[in-house]
Amino acid sequence: MKDVRLPTLFEIIIVLGVFLALVLSFTVFLDLPIQLALFVSWFIAMLLGIRLGYSYKDLQNAIVHGISNGLEAVLILVSVGALIGTWIAGGVVPTLIYYGLEFIHPSIFLLATLIICSIMSVATGTSWGTVGTAGIAMIAIGEGLGIPLPLVAGAILSGAYFGDKLSPLSDSTVLASSLSKVDVLAHVRAMLYLSIPAYVITAILFTVVGFMYGGKNIDLDKVEFLKSSLQNTFDIHIWMLIPAVLVIVLLAMKKPSMPVIVIGALLGAIWAVVFQGMDIAHAIATAYNGFSIKTDVEFLNGLLNRGGIVGMLDSLVVIIFGLGFGGLLEKLGVLKVIVSTFEKKLTSAGNVTLSTLIVAFLANIFGCAMYVSLILTPKIMEDSYDRLHLDRRVLSRNSEVGGTLTSGMVPWSDNGIYMAGILGVSTFSYLPFMWLSFVAIGLAIIYGYTGKFIWYTKNNTVKAEKLG
């Protein structure tokens, strides 16, 4: 077998620099699909791999392994696409929009959005499902109320990621805890010390900003026109929400996400036939092609013409190519070399915390997927925590914060692509309003350097995870 070596820091800088140059030049200057940039990046990384002594077969297996790490996300993405299509056709999403316009006052809309998405994400454990259902409805309501969509998207994502990093049902919660060798409930308790203060601060911010709007930009005629248009197009009744309630209940019962979402999509198709008068073939087709309608209201068309598996294909390709690139970087040991370069400076809980957050963010940038970040960060950083006798709960918490809360900030990552596509708001537009993410990251750094809620273990084992 041919000897292989780790890359030098210079080689890493070259490869990652070329990656960023490709992504930026393709998307910003050449107006080419980001998928092409990610695909070309495979071969840039493979050239480095061959230089390091790896065979083509080794590198191909690394790509396959990287993609396999995110297959669950791919399956959920396909399922959510089907769900959105049938739920619009079945009147579920239109009913959510209607009642939101009816009962939510503009002054508290942003706070209500944060709370609604938080409750749903904690109950279901999925940020993607939350954004694909409640998120779509809140975006539509926000547009109807005249509230800037990037601000609405920030409230949606703050609520959605709150549950994704805290719910015991969340795959990210389970992944961060298991790879850090921490009991999942011990991990959740450790997260509470960070999540609750961050959530309160975020809620205050959205409340203050919400009252600044206070209905000043609201066009009441537009709201009433939108409500009447929804009633004229769909059968709007409270029982239209039964599929949504059932999905939330099943996910809260810890049933597997993908089958539950598929059941929800099937119910949406049934609702489309029974309550909306759609023929069976057309109702089923909305799961694949998405919902499509032409009304005299252009605004309504923009709200409702979406969903379907087809609508997710571009995102799927980005995720697959991104996961493959992340698999190559993991195989080549890129992040491990970066961390080892600065390891001598990791002499305090604060420095280790900051480094963990940076590694997790870099893994999202170059690994292009939250799963890559959550898998690699604990593996790369665990020795530094053990060397300082830091409890593994601190590792799992920092990995979760850095991996989950920054995943939606990267335009070419799985979360960035999905959130921007579903909400119709670009990543860079909603990024400044992801207040929960910024507050939580800031608190994690403060905790690290002040020693607040930082736990140690004398015997350098993970037994301390059971404390507190």
UniProtKB/Swiss-Prot annotation:
Membrane-spanning ranges: 9-29, 30-50, 73-93, 96-116, 136-156, 192-212, 233-253, 258-278, 309-329, 357-377, 405-425, 428-448
Keywords: Antiport, Cell membrane, Ion transport, Membrane, Sodium, Sodium transport, Transmembrane, Transmembrane helix, Transport
Protein localization: Cell membrane
GO MF annotations, alphabetized: sodium:proton antiporter activity
Keyword set includes Cell membrane: yes
Pfam families recorded: Na_H_antiporter
Major localization class: membrane
Keyword field contains Ion transport: yes
GO cellular component: plasma membrane
Topology within the bilayer: Multi-pass membrane protein
InterPro entries for the chain: Na/H_antiport_NhaC (IPR004770), Na/H_Antiport_NhaC-like_C (IPR018461), NhaC_Na-H+_Antiporter (IPR052180)
PANTHER family: MALATE-2H(+)/NA(+)-LACTATE ANTIPORTER, MALATE-2H(+)_NA(+)-LACTATE ANTIPORTER
Job of this protein: Couples proton uptake and Na(+) efflux to the substrate-product malate/lactate antiport, in an electroneutral malate-2H(+)/Na(+)-lactate exchange. Plays a role in supporting growth to high density on malate at reduced protonmotive force.
Protein family membership: Belongs to the NhaC Na(+)/H(+) (TC 2.A.35) antiporter family.
Protein's name according to its UniProt entry: Malate-2H(+)/Na(+)-lactate antiporter
Record organism: Bacillus subtilis (strain 168)
Species lineage: Bacteria, Bacillati, Bacillota, Bacilli, Bacillales
Gene name, Swiss-Prot/TrEMBL: mleN
